[in-house]
Amino acid sequence: MSSVKIANKQLGPGYPCYVIAEIGINHNGDIDLAKRLISVAVAAGCDAVKFQKRSVDVVYSAKELEQPRPNPFGDTNGDLKRGLEFGQEDYEEISNFCKQVKIDWFVSPWDEASVDFVEQFNPPVYKIASASLTDDALLQHVRKTGKPVIASTGMSTYAEIDHAIEVLGKENLILMHTTSTYPAKYEQLNLRAIPTMIERYGIPVGYSGHETGIPTTVAAAVLGACCVERHITMDRAMWGSDQAASLEPNGISRLVRDIRLCEQSMGDGVKRVYEEEIPVMKKLRRVGAAA
């Protein structure tokens, strides 16, 4: 199986797990909060941060946008969606800040115009959200950029995944196993799908987690996920639809730490007696006992 290069890092078998801190819309439309979250990801040792980009009037119908929905930005669903979108100056600030603190950044574009907008910043990769996996026009548009693609597969059948791969091609493609509920139930995470998908498709597979807690995402890395993604927040009690299923600063730090400890612990699979074990063996084993 070949690896996929994102920026200066290889993703695939034998390489460290690439950890993505999903900021998404947890910035609540506040660029200063977004930069604080980027700093949290850097301090934790994450490899990248990810945002979401939408052309609101393209992704949502006028009827959807007109729906009453009181929120910090106004009284309608449209006020909310527009309030959560960053524009040109915001993304310039994000791009410059990420360069300054040396962390990769990219987006999940929800429409073709958003791809065109983000291309000016030359992201190292694009992420296809699970909701967009069946959007052939978007997949084709993303593939035309020539950038690597990470495609999430939540709420998708094998037939739908197979078709997406036909559209995207396997070159420089990473699939992501995920369960699209927020927060996801542990019994529905189905982590064994990760090695199953690796065997079925012969390309790198990652994991996007929407569960609470840390151990299951670490388990995904141990099961072979080449990358993992978790939402981050300053405080799970903050306003916002994704905050409750996110990791706070201490949580994302522990996640990265535990994944790296597991990577150190895997070894090469050859059973051996380590030099440090010999004095313990001499002390604890009975003299004359069978080896």
Where are these regions (language model features)?
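Catalytic cores and adjacent flexible loops of soluble metabolic enzymes
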Residues: 1-291
